[in-house]
């Protein structure tokens, strides 16, 4: 049986507010925090080969997404919708088709994603994984 593609789905603001250095950037300007997180996730994707999807709460009329298929996929929720809802929908739609890992501090979101077959980790666990991978990549 072929190996299923691996995806990491990240609740962007959940991670930003859990990591002190990103929270500090968020206080200055939210775009700085988002860009710093995306850069780290891009590195993680490059090092591991695991595809990364990051979801942020947005303000627009529709769900926005990045267009480069080889880059980190970035989604913004539409007005009146939360990033949580998008993460849950992605887990529901793809949880049994792909190997999913969901990074969020939201307990309900973790429960929903887990019920859909995803492995759930906290932002702190994500930080640890990223540090381990970075250390191995530098050797």
What are these regions (language model features)?
Residues 2-10, 14-139:
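Nuclease catalytic cores that cleave nucleic-acid phosphodiester bonds
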């Amino acid at each position: 049986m072929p190996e299923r593609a691996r995806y990491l789905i990240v609740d962007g603001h959940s991670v930003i507010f859990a990591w002190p250095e990103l929270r500090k950037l968020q206080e200055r300007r939210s775009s700085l925090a988002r860009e710093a997180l995306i850069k780290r996730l891009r590195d993680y994707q490059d090092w591991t080969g695991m595809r990364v999807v990051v979801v942020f709460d947005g303000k627009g009329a529709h769900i926005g997404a990045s267009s480069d298929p080889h880059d980190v996929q970035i989604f913004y929720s539409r007005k009146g919708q939360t990033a949580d809802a998008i993460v849950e929908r992605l887990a529901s739609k793809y949880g049994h088709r792909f190997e999913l890992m969901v990074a969020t501090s939201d307990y309900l979101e973790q429960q929903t994603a887990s019920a859909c077959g995803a492995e759930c980790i906290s932002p702190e666990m994500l930080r640890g994984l990223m540090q381990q991978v970075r250390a191995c990549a530098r050797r």
